[in-house]
């Protein structure tokens, strides 16, 4: 079986071929490839451009000086010029950052990145690592979308699993792996997923990270146990080919801890907002209203 045969199979299953045929190839989306400081640069760039050929891909060589709590320097070298993180962000305005870099604990850096992510500035994808510690701390701190690998070799029955670092399952949280992508290692699978997100944004518009995760979960293929599991997370992402309803209530802020759940139950028709565009999240339910909600949920899942 040739490499093109393998790619053809996964591109079909994951919806990539269909998106390309419909003209969604990542145009208008900027991806920072945080891999220019390793031998992964050419490999990961090729993956990004293969899945999202019209996206703008910028390679960055990143250096940082940190302690467990303090960020002393965080520089991004792009096309021979060095930028601080803020300068990089303000200059290139990335929609997606693809990386396998988050291997050391640094609260200040991680909090800064999480602030940008929660504000909807960009989505970050991080490789969980094949058999080392890379990615582990970033995964545990819940900064990025954590990507494991499953190399299909052309069909679902022949999968090489590399879903996480070499820690046994007893030391892993169930949310260690967020999703998996096709690739012969997590550093390959991560740009696969990042580029899928670029295709999604090209079709449906730019979305915050938490909202993307909630939208895409129903379209994922379980590769292991039914539901979320420690090896495959929510599974293999399949790009949707339908209208996506994105609920926006003017009294539910982007940083509201319940936003993703509120959007989901509204999209599914379990609860609705009010005619004035509000959800009124602090209002109480009556027993009658609760009965209706539970019945709608039952009808949805049965």
State each model region's role.
Residues 35-108, 223:
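Subtilisin-like peptidase catalytic core
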Residues 8-17, 86-89, 94-98, 144-146, ...:
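C-terminal subdomain of the subtilisin-like protease fold in secreted/lumenal serine endopeptidases
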Residues 30-35, 56-61, 95-100, 123-127, ...:
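Structural recognition of the beta-strand scaffold that forms the well-ordered cores
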């Amino acid at each position: 079986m040739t490499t093109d045969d393998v790619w053809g199979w996964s591109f079909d299953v994951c919806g990539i071929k269909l998106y390309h045929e419909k003209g969604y190839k990542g145009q208008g989306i900027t991806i920072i490839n945080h891999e220019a400081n390793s031998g992964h640069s050419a490999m990961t760039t090729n993956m990004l451009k293969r899945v999202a050929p019209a996206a703008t891909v910028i390679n960055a060589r990143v250096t940082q000086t940190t302690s467990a709590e303090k960020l002393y320097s965080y520089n991004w070298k792009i096309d021979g010029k060095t930028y601080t993180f803020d300068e990089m962000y303000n200059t290139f305005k990335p929609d997606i950052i693809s990386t396998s870099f988050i291997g050391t604990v640094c609260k200040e850096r991680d909090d800064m990145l999480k602030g940008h992510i929660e504000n909807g500035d960009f989505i970050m994808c991080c490789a969980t690592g094949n058999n080392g510690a890379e990615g582990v701390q970033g995964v545990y701190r819940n900064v990025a979308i954590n990507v494991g690998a499953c190399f299909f070799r052309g069909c679902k029955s022949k999968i090489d699993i590399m879903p996480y670092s070499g820690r046994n399952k007893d030391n892993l949280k169930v949310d260690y792996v967020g999703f998996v992508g096709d690739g012969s290692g997590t550093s390959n699978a991560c740009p696969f997923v990042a580029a899928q997100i670029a295709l999604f944004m090209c079709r449906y518009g730019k979305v915050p990270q938490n909202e993307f995760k909630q939208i895409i979960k129903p379209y994922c293929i379980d590769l292991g146990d039914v539901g979320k599991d420690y090896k495959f997370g929510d599974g293999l992402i399949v790009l949707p080919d339908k209208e996506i309803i994105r609920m926006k209530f003017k009294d539910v802020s982007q940083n509201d801890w319940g936003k993703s759940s509120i959007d989901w139950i509204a999209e599914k028709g379990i609860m609705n907002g009010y005619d004035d565009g509000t959800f009124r999240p602090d209002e109480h339910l009556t027993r009658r209203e609760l009965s209706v909600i539970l019945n709608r949920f039952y009808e949805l899942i049965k």
